[in-house]
């Protein structure tokens, strides 16, 4: 097996429930190249960053193929346009693309609309994962997230929470995962986004899903290629492809020191890693309580059970969704039940690492991985507990 060690320090932020970040400070190589896909243009000729974040492809010069990179770029553009809930786009025939934003406009319209096979697949997986995570992945809390406005920041300040009455209002309008089939009804390629209760405005936001879903589509495109590619989306959802079983070591960032890491994990061929954390994009209360961007759909606030949650799986979509959902769950039995349900449904293996803070900046790690899978562990780790699945 050929191993190319790439050290990626993962920091995390989540904007509107979705965006996450990783900083790469890797061992340099003369042949390594980075490719950044171009921004996408909406119907008003405004530039939109690919997947609304920084997307990077790492490849090796000896294996360079412009045709391959162009093909990957086409896949990224196609699914960015479908998953975007903020912008309209046109296709090659100058027709409006029926994407998530287009579907949101049909909320409460009982006639529904016909959509592409690709959007049907997106919606079907959305519904399935909402049920499997028992609503901790909830793509209908966009209004709640937006009610926080600009409080979340990479340069946090002391703020007051938003009004509790406003949070209660949005919680009362939160979609119950048991009702998802009644709200988003799929019949072949026909979709009806039914009105829920008496809620005037309801929209789908797939920020905690989209990067992983797109990464899987890219891996499908690469399935028969011989090139080695590392796809880094928003620099938290990371997947690797290699025809020669090249592996990468991915360092999980220390929440107290953005230039250091607490341990590294091996990312094998065609596997994925996704991380969520509270150490960026947050604000502080007067008493020092951290309010981060990852909101619990059942309380309307962020939780402080963990500093970091990292999920590894063959499915980038699963890793992306679970890293967000598990962040808000303290009950380890419920977390394991959800992991098992997802594993059984998607026929994948899922492992998780929880990092919690202790006194004096010491960290406690709980993981379903064997201890020897945590590489280059930091001295800031007080203890490591292996969890049974």
Where are the language model's segments positioned?
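Mature catalytic core of soluble alpha/beta enzymes
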Residues: 2, 18-389
């Amino acid at each position: 097996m050929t191993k190319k060690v790439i050290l990626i320090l993962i920091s995390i932020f989540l904007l509107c429930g979705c965006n996450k970040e990783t900083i790469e400070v890797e061992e340099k190589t003369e042949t390594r190249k980075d490719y950044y896909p171009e921004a996408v243009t909406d119907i008003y000729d405004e530039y939109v960053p690919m997947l609304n974040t920084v997307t990077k492809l790492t490849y090796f010069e000896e294996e360079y193929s412009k045709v391959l990179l162009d093909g990957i770029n086409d896949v990224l553009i196609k699914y960015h346009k479908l998953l975007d809930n903020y912008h309209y786009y046109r296709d090659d025939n100058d027709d409006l693309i029926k994407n998530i934003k287009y579907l949101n406009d049909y909320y409460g319209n009982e006639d529904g609309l016909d959509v592409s096979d690709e959007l049907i697949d997106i919606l079907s997986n959305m519904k399935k994962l909402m049920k499997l995570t028992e609503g901790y992945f909830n793509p209908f809390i966009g209004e709640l997230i937006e009610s926080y406005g600009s409080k979340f920041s990479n340069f946090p300040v002391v703020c007051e929470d938003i009004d509790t009455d406003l949070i209660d209002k949005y919680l009362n309008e939160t979609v119950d995962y048991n009702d998802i089939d009644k709200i988003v009804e799929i019949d072949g390629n026909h979709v009806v986004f039914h009105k829920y209760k008496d809620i005037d405005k309801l929209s789908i936001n797939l920020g905690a899903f989209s990067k992983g879903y797109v990464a899987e589509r890219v891996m499908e495109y690469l399935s028969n290629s011989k090139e080695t590619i590392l796809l880094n989306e928003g620099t938290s959802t990371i997947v690797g492809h290699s025809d020669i079983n090249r592996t990468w070591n991915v360092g999980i960032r220390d929440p107290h020191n953005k230039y250091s890491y607490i341990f590294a994990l091996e990312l094998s061929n065609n596997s994925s890693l996704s991380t969520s954390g509270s150490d960026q994009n947050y604000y502080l209360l007067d008493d020092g309580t951290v309010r981060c961007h990852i909101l619990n759909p059942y309380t309307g606030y962020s939780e402080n059970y963990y500093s970091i949650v990292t999920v590894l799986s063959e499915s980038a979509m699963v890793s992306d969704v679970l890293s967000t959902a598990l962040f808000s769950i303290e009950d380890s039995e419920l977390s394991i039940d959800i992991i098992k349900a997802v594993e059984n449904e998607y026929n994948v293996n899922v492992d998780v690492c929880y990092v919690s803070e202790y006194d004096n900046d010491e960290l406690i790690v709980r993981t379903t991985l064997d201890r020897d899978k945590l590489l280059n562990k930091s001295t800031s780790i007080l203890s490591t507990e292996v969890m049974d699945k």
